[in-house]
Design a protein with these regions (language model features):
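Metal-dependent phosphoesterase signature
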Residues: 1-44
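Substrate-recognition element of Asp-dependent hydrolases with the DxDx(T/V) motif
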Residues: 33-37, 42-76
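Anion (oxyanion) recognition and catalysis
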Residues: 50-51, 81, 121
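A structural signal for isolated positions on well-ordered beta-strands in alpha/beta enzyme cores
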Residues: 55-57, 89, 108, 126-128
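Substrate-recognition "cap/lid" segment bordering the active-site pocket of phosphatases
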Residues: 61-108, 114-118
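Structural recognition of alpha->loop->beta junctions
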Residues: 76-90, 139-162
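Acidic, Mg2+-coordinating phosphoryl-transfer loop and its flanking beta/alpha structural elements
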Residues: 109-147
Length: 162
């Protein structure tokens, strides 16, 4: 089948151990990263937000599989460049995204992980849960959802009156 979302493995194979999930990603991560495409309008919206003077910080929990390695960071940077996604800072290996968001003065945090959104929101940072295959059927009355990057852009301007 087609894996369209990085969290889909954990959702589809919830009976897997963390070791099995790590083994899967060790084997297939680069291939998945190579063929993945940005969500519709993501590139354009991020570019527009950057042009409006916003700092774009990409916070990901992706981590290097080998200590001292840079393979995941290199592929991530190449993917961002290939897809025209502009950013000021890339933070990899962020297991505590609230801490990273605070360290980088994040005004609006966007993620498709319910866990990460709840964590960041607990620190009083405005948060949007990007709806994806892995979270669309989950009730999240405590989180505000975004269904597209165009909607993210509109919500950002509503929140911050820019």
């Amino acid at each position: 089948g087609k894996i369209s979302d990085h969290n889909q493995i954990e959702t589809l194979y919830s009976h897997w151990t963390s070791e099995q999930i790590d083994a899967f990603w060790n084997k297939y991560f680069i291939k998945v990263l190579t063929i993945a495409r940005p969500k519709d309008c993501a590139t354009e919206v991020i570019k527009k937000l950057k042009e409006e003077g916003n700092n774009i910080v990409i916070i990901t929990s992706r981590y290097e599989y080998a200590e001292g390695g840079t393979e995941i960071e290199d592929y991530t940077r190449k993917w961002l460049e290939k897809n025209g996604i502009v950013y000021d800072k890339l933070v990899l290996g962020a297991q505590d995204k609230l801490q990273v968001a605070k360290e980088n003065n994040i005004d609006l945090f966007i993620d498709d992980s319910i866990k990460h959104c709840r964590n960041v929101q607990s620190g009083n940072i405005r948060t949007l849960l990007y709806t994806s295959i892995c979270n669309q059927g989950v009730e999240t009355p405590d989180l505000e959802r975004a269904y597209s990057w165009v909607q993210i852009y509109d919500k950002y301007h509503k929140y911050f009156q820019k």
